[in-house]
């Protein structure tokens, strides 16, 4: 009996050794950051706190080029990591340089398209914070088709995600419908703060402009407001099998009566501090989806309480309330970081949040979530 136990223990130790040896064969997940603003830099800080993942490249513009990543991103900790020097796309994006590139530079598919193509043609997966890329077929079907073709040709995957679109007003709604036999109407409401977001978002939302300028930009189509209603509603419709045909949206300025200052924006009393957006979808003449999304800098300063709400006229009915809101800045960074393994593992092509497994926090080793045959940097 003692001999059998010794043999068993020896086999167990050998198997344990072999298993551990096998698991350490895979190199850390290699990531390149393209764009080191509030979102890209924040994702970098998050990644340095995780196991099994390395930042191996960084891209930006202006005076950041030639400097250390750990000098240009506030609060990021280098520790004993190798230094990463910020460079140009041509200097950093090389074949086989990384498993995935995180692009945080633009909101619109047409503006980020060339960057995504450049990455894929160098043989790497790419994930972006560009809001329209959460479901680009909604407003840029031709570009979406081209991205899918280029990704498949190069054997890589491309996707966009974030807190919204990407989770709160689309994927979360879709997940709740899984408990329903029938769904008659969807209401999604998000009251959130814009304070964590960077200069690009401040510009898109018109923070600090006059009401007159807001109305002028709205009239000539240069006032972006929230980017994502078309993407979120089409994602919901496609998931549920509804025909997305009659879509509309509107916006009104949120005018502050006190001075408000966020890390990247300022609105004096009488100026625009945010945008109240509404969106809707009618199917066969019947309203099926309503979106309500007021967002502004420093809402708490004027007594506005943030929150996320999903209301389904369904069987059974659903009424989800989360207060305060899931914070948009951290939420967007985390969504992108936590989708990195899914993007790497995905079959080649353009992917969306309804094409990949449900994302989740990664508290262990990134390498444990990567399919070995999908790893680029072996």
Where do the protein language model's features map onto the residues?
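ADP-ribose/adenylate-binding Rossmann-like module
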Residues: 116-140
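A short helix->loop->beta-strand "cap" motif at the edges of active sites that frequently abuts
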Residues: 122-124, 153-156
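N-terminal glycine-/serine-/threonine-rich beta1-alpha1-beta2 phosphate-ribose binding loop
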Residues: 3-122, 342
């Amino acid at each position: 009996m003692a001999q059998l136990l010794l043999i068993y223990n020896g086999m167990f130790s050998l198997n344990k050794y072999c298993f551990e040896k096998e698991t350490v064969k895979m190199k850390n997940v290699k990531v390149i950051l393209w764009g080191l603003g509030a979102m890209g830099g924040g994702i970098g800080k998050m990644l340095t706190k995780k196991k099994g993942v390395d930042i191996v490249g960084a891209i930006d513009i202006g005076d950041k080029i030639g400097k250390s990543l750990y000098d240009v991103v506030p609060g990021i900790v280098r520790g004993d990591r190798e230094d990463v020097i910020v460079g140009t796309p041509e200097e950093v994006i090389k074949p086989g340089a990384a498993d995935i590139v995180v692009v945080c530079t633009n909101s619109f598919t047409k503006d980020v398209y060339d960057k995504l193509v450049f990455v894929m043609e160098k043989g790497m997966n790419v994930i972006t914070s560009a809001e329209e890329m959460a479901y680009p077929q909604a407003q840029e079907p031709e570009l979406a088709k081209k991205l899918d073709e280029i990704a498949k040709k190069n054997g890589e995957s491309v996707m966009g995600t974030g807190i919204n679109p990407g989770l709160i007003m689309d994927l979360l709604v879709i997940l709740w419908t899984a408990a329903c036999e029938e769904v008659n109407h969807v209401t999604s409401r998000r009251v959130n703060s814009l304070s964590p977001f960077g200069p690009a978002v401040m510009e898109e939302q018109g923070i600090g402009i006059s009401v007159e300028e807001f109305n002028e930009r709205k009239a000539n189509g240069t006032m972006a407001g929230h980017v994502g209603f078309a993407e979120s509603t089409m994602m919901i419709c496609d998931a549920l099998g509804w025909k997305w045909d009659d879509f509309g949206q509107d916006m009104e300025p949120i005018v502050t009566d006190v001075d408000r200052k966020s890390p990247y924006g300022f609105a004096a009393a009488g100026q625009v501090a945010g945008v109240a957006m509404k969106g809707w979808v009618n199917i066969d003449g019947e309203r099926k989806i309503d979106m309500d999304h007021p967002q502004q800098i420093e809402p708490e300063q004027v007594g506005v309480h943030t929150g996320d709400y999903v209301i389904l006229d369904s069987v059974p009915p659903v009424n989800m309330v989360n207060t305060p809101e899931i914070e948009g800045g951290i939420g967007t960074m985390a969504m992108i970081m936590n989708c990195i393994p899914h993007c790497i593992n995905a079959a080649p092509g353009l992917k969306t949040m309804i094409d990949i497994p449900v994302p989740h926090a990664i508290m262990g080793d990134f390498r444990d979530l990567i399919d070995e045959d999908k790893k680029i940097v072996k």
